[in-house]
Amino acid sequence: MNPRRKSRFKLVIFVVLGIAIASGLMLYALRQNIDLFYTPSEVIQGKDNNPNQKPEVGQRIRVGGMVVEGTVVRDPKSLKVRFDLNDIGPAITVEYEGILPDLFREGQGIVAQGVLTQSAVLSATEVLAKHDENYVPPELGEKMQKVHKPMGIKAADLKGESERDRQEKEGAK
């Protein structure tokens, strides 16, 4: 190898190594900001019912589901709130300290973002409530469609009000 070719080769190697190191450091720094989306069933059973695809304790995740009625427990001396969240399967417990959104209530859909402290307990840093009665986060909507199709539930049945809502409205009149 002549000296000129050798110096070019060294330059190319250094540039490639520099890009690889910079990319690795950038991915390492952004790793903590990557939040994977799960449903409560996937937190307990794993994605596609594969236990190897369950989130690990200590991992930052986002969980979307419905607040289970009768499970909201507020600490009278602080802003701590504890409630259960489920989809159509098992529920997980969410612990949150802070002011909840105005639209937060039992039986409504939310997305909680935080760290999994136990296999079925999420310590939330943020709780997002849905915008209106028809809003479903895109990730949750896709997951619910996959689950409901095999059960024979049509997409039209998932939108709007339920039979129970209609009965309550008629009873109030």
Swiss-Prot record:
It is a single-pass type II membrane protein. Residues 156-173 have a biased composition (Basic and acidic residues). The chain crosses the membrane at residues 9-29. It is found in: Cell inner membrane. Coiled coil: none annotated. Heme binds at H131, Y135. Its main location: membrane. Residues 1-8 are cytoplasmic. GO terms for cellular component: plasma membrane. It comes from the Bacteria. One of its GO terms (molecular function) is heme binding. Residues 139-173 are annotated as: Disordered. One of its GO terms (biological process) is cytochrome complex assembly. Keywords: Cell inner membrane, Cell membrane, Cytochrome c-type biogenesis, Heme, Iron, Membrane, Metal-binding, Signal-anchor, Transmembrane, Transmembrane helix. Residues 30-173 are periplasmic. InterPro entries: CcmE, CcmE-like_sf, NA-bd_OB-fold. It holds the Pfam family CcmE. Heme chaperone required for the biogenesis of c-type cytochromes. Transiently binds heme delivered by CcmC and transfers the heme to apo-cytochromes in a process facilitated by CcmF and CcmH. Belongs to the CcmE/CycJ family. HAMAP family: CcmE. This is Cytochrome c-type biogenesis protein CcmE. It comes from Haemophilus influenzae (strain PittGG). The lineage of its organism: Bacteria, Pseudomonadati, Pseudomonadota, Gammaproteobacteria, Pasteurellales.
